[in-house]
Amino acid sequence: MHSSLIKLGFLLLLLQVSLSHAQLSPSFYDKTCPQVFDIVTNTIVNALRSDPRIAASILRLHFHDCFVNGCDASILLDNTTSFRTEKDAFGNANSARGFDVIDKMKAAIEKACPRTVSCADMLAIAAKESIVLAGGPSWMVPNGRRDSLRGFMDLANDNLPGPSSTLKQLKDRFKNVGLDRSSDLVALSGGHTFGKSQCQFIMDRLYNFGETGLPDPTLDKSYLATLRKQCPRNGNQSVLVDFDLRTPTLFDNKYYVNLKENKGLIQSDQELFSSPDAADTLPLVRAYADGQGTFFDAFVKAIIRMSSLSPLTGKQGEIRLNCRVVNSKSKIMDVVDDALEFASFM
């Protein structure tokens, strides 16, 4: 009975998404590129062999893409003379990663289905497959997005939640992009159930919280001692620390168990449980900690909503041939490559 209700709820959610964004559909590539899902999965599986972090990194790319002008693959663009890349924004600089895997994925898709699958759709599919490979839930990704023609670094600086954000700031950032439900914020924050963060993002919590010269009082004392060993006061701040001390490579509900024990890694995570303003988020943390299925159901609903934010569809934008550059640049680079190849035979 419970399973049937979940399926019914999922179908109703897809109907809601399709009514809001009629051009997005889980069957969008059924006839034009049905192999896209296998290509994406195989690329991630191969990458995981040498990089256990890559699944979490790809999910983060999708999150940070959708929070800036909708899910349009703008985060994948490199710098040009006309705009600064989102890769240079505070929330991405020296931390966003996985672009080489995205390049391999796109090259394989272009070989199989030329000029068919957008980078934005590919990234949304890759985020889902990354979660599934890490033990998380599966869902049908609504597709049909197209790619932006530019990046938005300033908007990324304004929209992306930061590691030291208060609960009020988090709610404001989510509301600004169209995610105004507490369940969206708490469920999507569960993406931190795997992956790593750098010491630089928690140093204030460990040593000088709120300019007090003291650690964050919400931090569990034993966890504080552990983190201080990993991130000494004058140590290398690029050292990586697991978000989830229990199951760092699995997509599960242990993130919320950690929050209940005051063992959230970054301030913005612990705020969901420990903030004085957490009257609406604290019960959700408890519910997700007590039931992994409850968390999975909420996460799927929230990520479908997020991935359907303000998509470019129809003839808007383009389908990039190379996710790093808009197509006019891709064509120029192809001409240059062809010329260099020709010259090598002269």
From Swiss-Prot:
Q: What does this protein do?
A: Removal of H(2)O(2), oxidation of toxic reductants, biosynthesis and degradation of lignin, suberization, auxin catabolism, response to environmental stresses such as wounding, pathogen attack and oxidative stress. These functions might be dependent on each isozyme/isoform in each plant tissue.
Membership in a protein family: Belongs to the peroxidase family. Classical plant (class III) peroxidase subfamily.
Q: Which residues are glycosylated?
A: 79, 236
Look up the record and name the cofactor or cofactors this protein needs: heme b; Ca(2+)
Q: Which residues bind substrate?
A: 161
Q: Where does Ca(2+) 2 bind?
A: 193, 244, 247, 252
Q: Which organism is it from?
A: Arabidopsis thaliana (Mouse-ear cress)
Coiled-coil features, chain-numbered ranges: none
Remaining remarks: There are 73 peroxidase genes in A.thaliana.
Q: What protein does this entry describe?
A: Peroxidase 38
Q: What biological processes does GO assign it?
A: hydrogen peroxide catabolic process; response to oxidative stress
